[in-house]
From Swiss-Prot:
Any Pfam family the entry gives: Adenylsucc_synt
Protein name: Adenylosuccinate synthetase
Enzyme kind, highest EC tier: ligase
Gene designation per UniProt: purA
GO CC, one annotated term: cytoplasm
Residues annotated for Mg(2+) binding in this entry: D14, G41
InterPro entries: Adenylosuccin_syn_GTP-bd (IPR018220), Adenylosuccin_syn_Lys_AS (IPR033128), Adenylosuccinate_synth_dom1 (IPR042109), Adenylosuccinate_synth_dom2 (IPR042110), Adenylosuccinate_synth_dom3 (IPR042111), Adenylosuccinate_synthetase (IPR001114), P-loop_NTPase (IPR027417)
Lineage: Bacteria, Pseudomonadati, Pseudomonadota, Gammaproteobacteria, Pasteurellales
Species in which this protein is naturally found: Haemophilus influenzae (strain PittEE)
HAMAP family cross-referenced by the UniProt entry: Adenylosucc_synth
Residues given in the record as substrate binding sites: A300, V301, T302, G303, R304, P305, R306
Length: 432
């Protein structure tokens, strides 16, 4: 009997989802993206070769896997073609194995221009977006004015819709933000040049997934960003523009929620965050700098340095509630090698003195929050590339067990290096 497994970030993104998707793809027929856009950077290292996928599902590196882009994903035609060409130049067959929902909203140059203009206007209060037009594209979707992949089938109607929406955007860009307008003809020509390639990959994603389930096929749903960046449940307004939680699978792919069997939450052995917003356990000392250095904490898409801090079990408890997480995969365990002590945030002290065990929702409710830590002995031994759990240092094992205790969720997979072979599967999500 086939299983449907969701892989998603349980923190603020950048947890190492791409590697784990790639690892588990060996046993699936389909890998599905259901939210986000090319603001996601999933880094895979296979046999020492590095690949960063932003829009195409990570299963594309497996020749027997079909990759699906669901309706919840915003698609930049330019970014999609660039990524396809990069993979095809390496001999990977993409367009024969990539299927796209016609309901995917399109990201076009005016979305990018608006994204940049808004961030510049916000100055120090900027959200910290990737500047790739994700938010404005989702806005158009909700406002019911957006262009979608399906619109590319009727080129005359597309041109007319584009003209109207570009007038709307250019009026704001020129008159309010005082920046250059986006050129209509160039935008139209660039999209039309690749329209046939994109429409050639359009398919009924919901029916494909339903048929696969009925045929007993394994399906993997690949999340982007992380739980605490969810548009509804994250640290609003310092969030992304899509539902990064498990509920986004159903709405973003058309797959019935009762058909999901297992939710794997990816967590780092510590915490990181890119951009603005609350981060209770953030470290500003030498320890934080050392974690960033050892963990090579720079964004795969933006190159921005990530903020680093101790493991936050309070935020994770919220992620467990939101996602009904079945088990964790802990990545970058080896980054904590060599520290005299390691810490776990087990509660927050609110400004009024109240002790809470679950993270607040809105960013404003995090102001003045203090972390309450448990301190555990660190380990000096090297855990890098260890693939036998029994060979881990005892203090490392104690740290893992304590995280399981304070969160109430088992750690089913451990990662001790960037390559997919540097992994320990303690409980197989497809057999759970």
């Amino acid at each position: 009997m086939g299983k449907s497994v969701v892989i998603l970030g349980a923190q603020w993104g950048d947890e190492g989802k791409g590697k784990i998707v790639d690892l588990l793809t060996d046993r699936v027929k389909y890998v599905v993206r259901y939210q986000g856009g090319h603001n996601a950077g999933h880094t895979l290292i296979i046999n020492g070769e590095k690949t960063v996928l932003r829009l195409i599902p990570s299963g594309m590196l497996h020749p027997n896997v079909t990759c699906l882009i669901g309706n919840g994903v915003v698609v930049s035609p330019e970014a999609l073609m660039k990524e396809m060409c990069e993979l095809e130049s390496r001999g990977i067959k993409v367009r024969e194995r990539l299927l796209i929902s016609e309901a995917c909203p399109l990201i076009l140059p005016y979305h990018v221009a608006m994204d940049h203009a808004r961030e510049a206007a916000l100055g120090k209060k900027a959200i910290g977006t990737t500047g790739r037009g994700i938010g404005p594209a989702y806005e158009d979707k909700v406002a019911r004015r957006g262009l979608r992949v399906g619109d590319l089938f009727n080129k005359e109607a597309f041109a007319e819709k584009l003209k109207n929406i570009l007038e709307y955007y250019n009026f704001q860009l020129v008159n309010y933000y005082k920046v250059e307008p986006v050129d209509y003809q160039k935008t139209l020509d660039d999209v039309m040049a690749i329209a046939d390639v994109i429409t050639g990959m359009v398919a009924d994603i919901t029916t494909i997934l339903d048929t696969a389930r009925k045929n007993g096929e394994h399906i993997l749903f690949e999340g982007a960003q992380g739980t605490m960046l969810d548009i509804d449940h994250g640290t609003y307004p310092y969030v992304t523009s899509s539902n990064t939680t498990a509920g986004g699978v159903a709405t973003g792919s058309g797959f019935g929620p009762r058909n999901l069997d297992y939710v794997l939450g990816i967590i780092k052995a510590y915490c990181t965050r890119v951009g603005g917003g609350p981060f209770t356990t953030e470290l500003f000392d030498d320890v934080g700098a050392e974690i960033a250095r050892k963990g090579n904490e720079f964004g795969a898409v933006t190159g921005r340095p990530r903020r680093c801090g101790w493991f936050d079990a309070v935020a994770i408890r919220r992620a467990i509630q939101l996602n009904s997480i079945s088990g964790f995969c802990m990545t970058k365990l080896d980054v904590l090698d060599g520290f005299d002590e390691v810490k776990i945030c087990v509660a927050y002290k609110m400004p009024n003195g109240e002790i809470v065990e679950y993270a607040p929702l809105a960013a404003k409710d995090w102001e003045g929050v203090e972390p309450i830590y448990e301190t555990l002995p660190g380990w000096k031994e090297n855990t890098f590339r260890i693939t036998d759990v029994n060979k881990l240092p005892q203090n490392c094992i104690n740290y893992i067990k304590r995280i399981e205790e304070v969160t109430g969720v088992p750690i089913d997979i451990l990662s001790t290096g960037p390559d997919r072979v540097e992994t320990m599967i303690l409980r197989d999500p497809f057999a759970a």
